[in-house]
Amino acid sequence: PEFTNWRDEQMACRESVAFYDQSFHMTTTFVRGKDAVALLSHLCVNSFSTFGVDRSRHSVMCSPDGYLIGDGILYCLAEDELALVGRQAGHNWLRYNAAVGDWDVSLEEDEFMSDNPNGRRSMYRFQVEGPHAPALMEQLTGAPMPTAPKLHLLHITIAGHHVTAMQHTMAGNPGWEL
């Protein structure tokens, strides 16, 4: 069946392959400009010493007093372009700090489905994971997936469309976020 329950989803991750649509529940904020990395480095507790183009990382944002504000996955798409993906609290904190600080950045939000004024996303996000994920990805791309360290971005083609794939897993099996 197309949809059953959480237990079947978990078993697919462990025994075959699961395909998740993550487009509906997380906002993406694109941060562009010469201060993009500096702004996110200021807001996140993570080190940015090894962060660069075609890399991603789990980012944790705290207030100046150390209280947790939010978290998400941060992608470096180009030297001066980042994308933050996650729940709304981190995006609100990012937007507030960009507005009140002296940062040379522009922000573009692609809100999750129910709050998106356009009624659709500009970018959709999916997770493919499980022991059979490499075979499925090879079938979709026509070639074995290139190997990359965890959280590195790969550029692949599926059905003639450019797709960015992040080597990533939630359950310890092979997986990619597309």
Language model regions located:
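Glycine/proline-enriched, intrinsically flexible loops and inter-domain linkers
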Residues: 1-177
